[in-house]
Amino acid sequence: MQKKRFEQQGEKTMPMIRAEFLTGKTQEQKRELVEALTRETARVLGVREQSVWVVLQEVEPENWAVAGTPLSER
């Protein structure tokens, strides 16, 4: 079972989750996101929550484009 494999690695397994999103989220939303990502990553991978790292990256709409158009122009 894959979960046991991760458990056997112990502290050597330190998953890092990166979440990128547009600016404008509240501190509460970001806190809830970090908690949920941490909890679910630990559950699925079978590691301790203390070993999960989460990095949030807020991006300005002019720096994020879809189909060649910055979101600030949509």
Regions found by a protein language model. Name each.
Residues 1-13:
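Short, Lys/Arg-enriched N-terminal segments with co-localized hydrophobic residues
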Residues 2, 31-33, 71:
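Residues in and immediately flanking transmembrane alpha helices
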Residues 10-11, 23, 66:
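Low-complexity intrinsically disordered segments
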Residues 16, 21-53:
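Amphipathic, hydrophobic secondary-structure cores in small proteins
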Residues 43-71:
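C-terminal structural segments of small proteins and small subunits
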Residues 74:
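A charged helix-plus-loop insertion that forms the helical arch/lid used to bind
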